[in-house]
Amino acid sequence: MKQSMVFSPTLREVPADAEIKSHQLLLRAGFMRQNASGIYSFLPFGLKVLHKVERIVREEMERAGAVELLMPAMQAAELWQESGRWYSYGSELMRMKDRNAREFALGATHEEVITDLVRDEVKSYKKLPLTLYQIQTKFRDEQRPRFGLLRGREFLMKDAYSFHATQESLDEVYDRLYKAYSNIFARCGLNFRAVIADSGAMGGKDTHEFMVLSDVGEDTIAYSDTSDYAANIEMAPVVATYTKSDEAEKALEKVATPDQKAIEEVSAFLNIEADKCIKSMVFKVDEKLVVVLVRGDHEVNDVKVKNVYGASVVELASHEEVKALLNWEVGSLGPINVTGDIEIIADHAVASIVNGCSGANEEGFHYVNVNPERDFKVSQYTDLRFIQEGDQSPDGNGTILFARGIEVGHVFKLGTRYSEAMNATFLDENGKTQPLIMGCYGIGVSRTVAAIAEQFNDENGLVWPKAVAPFHVHVIPVNMKSDAQREMGENIYNSLQEQGYEVLLDDRAERAGVKFADADLFGLPVRVTVGKKADEGIVEVKVRATGESEEVKVEELQTYIANILK
């Protein structure tokens, strides 16, 4: 492709609203442009990268036995109502009405549509297992779109769905697609981890996320320093043991703590360590109020609270709700003298506290010498806190460290969550009606492009891995007015294309500095500069990733490039 014919508008300045490298560079290099908040156009170079990622995804999905189809982006509300998610999915689901006032959703995901499709066509175990996938635009009304393609309102996604007669069949396909995902992200050149995850609004139980390691990632990964254990911090169990001291219990005492609300403030004011304080939080668990207790130096993990109750929705009660429903002061919440049918659950660490402190549910007061079970009753002790760096790894090997990650893929074992809700059944080999067992497997294709850009860049621009680069080689005649440079550049361009390389020829009448700056910004793997030594049959070859350059004779160029790109 000749650069003079390409629509690739570059920017010299960093856009003011672009916070992270990938967003900045994809805009500056002319790979995309914003249409509205969280909505982008892919320009020609960006589209080529997107297509490269799509091709890798398709190859690995088909190798894993999945078959491609395409479902509608616009989905009837009745299907979402049938599954129950019309009411529970939340405000991220974009809803609309047609001219006849019939309700629809723009597809945020396609479990309902695929389940409806398969239930009408697959009636026997003989047609199972079946794995179908699509690559299609998705829509989510993000409250705060940010970071360019990493959190948008419109994005390209690969979503696959598998249907099974037995759990063993699901396990087999799940493992196969787990490996396919690992292959996809490895082929894209990414540094990633597969981690144990929470299924969230998707439902189901067993699930893994594929996380690209990056400081700008919105998720925290907890991983072992000596084993391959890795989990989303929400899902990492705490295996620590706590020893209760033999200190004699003291008499409960209520003390004034004026203007002291945070654990750090209270512990400093009372001259007591934070790990002897009891942190109390009120949650709405499917609208039921629950008091959750953790140690003062720990944080409540609401996903674990949700899993304790098998709840659909868990959210922290607001200050106003706590005051109105319980007449408690949020800055001084505590478990003592809790009345009514409000349940108290506590993290294991709370049971070991002796002569601790807690809020008194009264403005400006706390209790000291608090002892669980003597001063208040707990209905259940369980794991309710976030794991911390330095904790023992849940697999028993090593200690936990943290890293940030960008989620680019997610695989779920949905089980019968959707098939039972939507009456999607088949006849088993005994002629009995059974619900289809399902799996779900998603990849953020456009998000993967951003994740690659986030991992592969330097101070001068993008540095694309060869598997996804829009072109393999960038040929730059420095002076297009020089017949020797222009003709050699075109000859190299043509011969490399004949060898199967994708080549970009900078045939613009621009200054050398502009051409080189754009080349660095585009980030193609190899740059061939045709300069003053063209008359001698010598060009300069530069590797973008390393910055290494070398003068090469034209007759040796193809072999030299082949060695770089092998």
Swiss-Prot record:
It is found in: Cytoplasm. It comes from the Bacteria. It catalyses: tRNA(Pro) + L-proline + ATP = L-prolyl-tRNA(Pro) + AMP + diphosphate. Pfam families: HGTP_anticodon, tRNA-synt_2b, tRNA_edit. PROSITE patterns: AA_TRNA_LIGASE_II. GO terms for biological process: prolyl-tRNA aminoacylation. One of its GO terms (molecular function) is transferase activity. Signal peptide: none annotated. Its main location: cytoplasm. It is an enzyme of class 6 (ligase). Homodimer. Belongs to the class-II aminoacyl-tRNA synthetase family. ProS type 1 subfamily. This is Proline--tRNA ligase 1. It comes from Bacillus cereus (strain ATCC 14579 / DSM 31 / CCUG 7414 / JCM 2152 / NBRC 15305 / NCIMB 9373 / NCTC 2599 / NRRL B-3711). The gene is proS1.
